[in-house]
Structures are given as structure tokens and as C-alpha cells.
């Protein structure tokens, strides 16, 4: 990165058209990878895409990690278009991140070991994974830690 690139960030010479810079991000995509040929096909489809810096493929976890200045939906569309394989954004996160990893909407048998379904993208599932306000009220009503709790017991 030269001096001209550094100085051009401070001055806008575009004459009305604004160019939005994409940020460097990591995109995880779930793709069914059966063999080394499938792995090579996915890698070649992504390496030709503009803005991609690194492609890492984990065939056992059915996971492709892309690092670069790209949009996640464009990466998924490129994999689907070029390879003909079904692809989606990686729906699993490590179980340490989720508050209730064994709730009915979060736990998934098809998830790799140590991962559960991401509740951030599906609001219906996330509602099941959290305790409701009435549920919290009932559990704290008889708590020893609550000073204004009921002393029936």
C-alpha cells in the first residue's frame, strides 16, 4: 500500500458517485463434499471470484471458509451456480456460544461434534431457546437469593 492509496482515503475525487468499500470478513458455507473432486470443484469456483483472499475446505465438517472482501450471499450463489451443489450459510456454531445448547430447537443430530444450530438466524428457534419473562418470574419467586421472595417453604 503506497502513499497515494493512503492519501486517497482522505480525499474524494469521484465526482458524485460514491464507492462503498466492503470490509474484510469470514464467510462459512455448508456444502456437501463427498470426494477430492468435489473439493477441487468448489475451490476452483471460489478462487476465481474477485475479493477472495483465502479458501479453506473442511470435508469432514462439510464446511467451506472464505476470507475476503465479499458478500456472503454472493459466495453462496457462486458455489450453487458454478458447481451445481446445494449450499447454504453455515448454520452451526460452537455449543459454548449458545445459552441453552440442548433446547429442542437448538440441538441438531446432524451437526458436527461440538456444534449446535445457530439461533441468531431463525427467530422461531431462538424464542424456544430462551426462557420467557413469566418463566423467569415463577422461578425467581421462590428463590433464596431474592429478598422479596415468597417464604412458603
From Swiss-Prot:
InterPro entries tied to this protein: HMA_dom, HMA_dom_sf
Disulfide cross-links: none
Residue stretch(es) of the prosequence: 151-153
Residue span, HMA domain: 24-88
Places the protein is found: Membrane
Record-listed a metal cation binding positions: 35, 38
Keyword Membrane in annotation: yes
Key words of the record: Cadmium, Lipoprotein, Membrane, Metal-binding, Methylation, Prenylation
Lipid-modified residues, S-farnesyl cysteine kind: 150
Family the UniProt entry places it in: Belongs to the HIPP family.
Function: Heavy-metal-binding protein. Binds cadmium. May be involved in cadmium transport and play a role in cadmium detoxification.
Entry protein name: Heavy metal-associated isoprenylated plant protein 25
Name of the gene: HIPP25
Amino acid at each position: 500500500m503506497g502513499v497515494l492509496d493512503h492519501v486517497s482515503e482522505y480525499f474524494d475525487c469521484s465526482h458524485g458517485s460514491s464507492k462503498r468499500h466492503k470490509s474484510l470478513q469470514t464467510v462459512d458455507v455448508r456444502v456437501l463434499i463427498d470426494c477430492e473432486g468435489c473439493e477441487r470443484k468448489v475451490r476452483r469456483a471460489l478462487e476465481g471470484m474477485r475479493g477472495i483472499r483465502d479458501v479453506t475446505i473442511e470435508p469432514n465438517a462439510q464446511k467451506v471458509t472464505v476470507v475476503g472482501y465479499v458478500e456472503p450471499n454472493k459466495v453462496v450463489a457462486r458455489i450453487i451456480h458454478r458447481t451445481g451443489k446445494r449450499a447454504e450459510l453455515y448454520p452451526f456454531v460452537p455449543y459454548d456460544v449458545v445459552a441453552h445448547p440442548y433446547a429442542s430447537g437448538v440441538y441438531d443430530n446432524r451437526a458436527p461434534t461440538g456444534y449446535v444450530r445457530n439461533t441468531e438466524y431463525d427467530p422461531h428457534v431462538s424464542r424456544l431457546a430462551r426462557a420467557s419473562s413469566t418463566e423467569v418470574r415463577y422461578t425467581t419467586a421462590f428463590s433464596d437469593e431474592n429478598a422479596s421472595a415468597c417464604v412458603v417453604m
